[in-house]
């Protein structure tokens, strides 16, 4: 991947949503909620604070849960990604 986020930003690839509910109902695209779970594919160097770089807590390969309306959606090489600040990440899964 050639995207390198700046500062405390993280690039995430959203994980696909379930096509069916637990009861077996197939969800149309219009009824699906915006994804909130993804995999970290790139991490910035961290933000500068008082002349020191604060390293991010997440790393490439982490599965994370993030705020529903956080970040900026971008398309690169035919793939869709989300670029957001580390503070928009709510939890690391696993």
UniProtKB/Swiss-Prot annotation:
InterPro entries in the record: Chaperonin_GroES (IPR020818), Chaperonin_GroES_sf (IPR037124), Chaprnonin_Cpn10_CS (IPR018369), GroES-like_sf (IPR011032)
Keyword Chaperone: yes
Single GO term (MF): metal ion binding
Main localization of the protein described in the UniProt heading: cytoplasm
Stored PROSITE patterns: CHAPERONINS_CPN10
Keyword annotations of the record: Chaperone, Cytoplasm
Domain of life: Bacteria
Any one of the GO CC terms: cytoplasm
One Pfam family hit: Cpn10
Family annotation (Gene3D superfamilies): GroES chaperonin
Subcellular location per the Swiss-Prot or TrEMBL entry: Cytoplasm
GO BP term, pick one: chaperone cofactor-dependent protein refolding
Similarity annotation: Belongs to the GroES chaperonin family.
Function description: Together with the chaperonin GroEL, plays an essential role in assisting protein folding. The GroEL-GroES system forms a nano-cage that allows encapsulation of the non-native substrate proteins and provides a physical environment optimized to promote and accelerate protein folding. GroES binds to the apical surface of the GroEL ring, thereby capping the opening of the GroEL channel.
Oligomer and partners: Heptamer of 7 subunits arranged in a ring. Interacts with the chaperonin GroEL.
Protein name per its UniProtKB record: Co-chaperonin GroES
Species name: Desulfitobacterium hafniense (strain Y51)
Gene: groES
């Amino acid at each position: 991947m050639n995207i390198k986020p700046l500062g405390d930003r993280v690039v995430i690839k959203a994980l696909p949503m379930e096509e069916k509910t637990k009861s077996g109902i197939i969800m149309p695209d219009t009824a699906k909620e915006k994804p909130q779970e993804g995999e970290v594919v790139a991490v910035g160097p961290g933000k500068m604070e008082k002349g020191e770089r604060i390293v991010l807590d997440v790393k490439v390969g982490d599965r994370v849960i993030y705020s529903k309306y956080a970040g900026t959606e971008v398309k690169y090489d035919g793939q869709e990604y989300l670029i957001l600040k580390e503070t928009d990440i709510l939890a690391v899964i696993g």
